[in-house]
From Swiss-Prot:
UniProt-annotated location(s): Cytoplasm
Function, in words: Catalyzes the condensation of (S)-aspartate-beta-semialdehyde [(S)-ASA] and pyruvate to 4-hydroxy-tetrahydrodipicolinate (HTPA).
Gene field: dapA
PROSITE patterns the UniProt entry points to: DHDPS_1, DHDPS_2
GO biological process annotation, one example: diaminopimelate biosynthetic process
Name of this chain's protein: 4-hydroxy-tetrahydrodipicolinate synthase
Cellular component GO terms held in the UniProt record: cytosol
Swiss-Prot/TrEMBL keywords: Amino-acid biosynthesis, Cytoplasm, Diaminopimelate biosynthesis, Lyase, Lysine biosynthesis, Schiff base
Length: 302
């Protein structure tokens, strides 16, 4: 009989929300609403919040807006909740500066995306992440692999080379591959906590050794995701599977077009006026919005 696998730690909890950035009618960041939404997400089961990542529209936020968002959310939720700042860039120098600023502004960690557009080789990726890790050694890092957006994938073997950086503690796997979890665990060992970057792959990734999820759907179904995770961890696999199947249509709807367009509409439909995304993203079209409204209504009845 094979020995039992060693489970990974959970440096940021199990359910993290990749938080939207609210805008007012003039397109300005609504920091007051951001604080209220952050507290609501925690009340609904999130143990951590990721501020100014992909869902937070980081490409269209200034660095000043991002720093203030971090400070507002940090103050809103208090010290008992993990707050991660999106500090990635395709410029290593810019990412280093942003990560240092996040550490100084009270972040519990940084989500650092693979550099986009310039398509560095694996050796360049290793050097990039090592420079960031060394620049803020006190700040735990979550490496973020999302090749569908960046055009480059961080190989498990490259991640393994970074395991001698003590603050490289976690990995957001958003390549769409369940096998990536196993490959990361085999290459890096259990010290690297792998988080699913896709709500729809959370349950199968948990079975492969992931510790949790950086979620979009938790904006509107946080308690149900928490219930699914807890059921799986307690051995109630049928209960977890039932939740997964009930939530799958919502997972699909939230990515029927570019994130965060649908989730912002879902929040609006749920009473949170977070505003439209900034250009070049657009509000959800009326047909998709109507379909999403029907899904949310049906879920409230189950």
């Amino acid at each position: 009989m094979s020995p039992a696998a060693e489970l990974s730690p959970t440096p940021f909890g199990r359910l993290l929300t990749a938080m939207v950035t609210p805008f007012d009618a003039e397109g300005r960041v609504d920091f007051a609403l951001a604080g209220r939404l952050a507290r609501h997400l925690v009340e609904e089961g999130s143990e951590g919040l990721v501020v100014c990542g992909t869902t937070g529209e980081s490409p269209t936020l200034s660095w000043q807006e991002q720093v203030k968002m971090l400070e507002v959310v940090r103050q809103a939720v208090g010290p008992g909740v993990k707050v991660l700042a999106g500090t990635g860039s395709n410029s290593t120098g810019e990412a280093v500066k942003a990560t240092r600023e996040a550490a100084a502004s009270g972040a519990d960690g940084a989500l650092v995306v693979v550099p986009y557009y310039n398509k560095p080789p694996q050796e360049g990726l290793e050097a990039h992440f090592r420079a960031i890790a060394n620049a803020a050694p006190e700040l735990p890092l979550m490496l973020y692999n999302v090749p569908g957006r960046t055009g480059t994938s961080l190989a498990p073997a490259t991640a393994a080379q970074l395991m001698n950086c003590a603050n490289v503690v976690s990995f957001k796997a958003a390549s769409g591959s369940i096998e990536e979890v196993t490959e990361l665990r085999l290459a890096c060992g259990p010290r690297l906590a792998v988080y699913s970057g896709d709500d729809g792959l959370l349950l199968p990734m948990l079975s492969a050794g992931a510790v949790g999820v950086v979620s979009v759907a938790s904006h509107v179904v946080g308690r149900r995701l928490r219930h699914m995770i807890d059921a799986y961890l307690s051995g109630q696999n049928a209960v977890a599977l039932g939740q997964h199947e009930q939530l799958t249509p919502l997972f699909q709807a939230l990515f029927a077009t570019s994130n965060p367009i649908p989730v912002k509409a879902a929040l609006e439909l749920s009473g949170w006026p977070v505003g439209a995304p900034r250009l070049p993203l657009l509000p959800l079209n009326s047909a998709m919005r109507d379909s999403l409204a029907d899904l949310l209504t049906a879920l409230r009845q189950t």
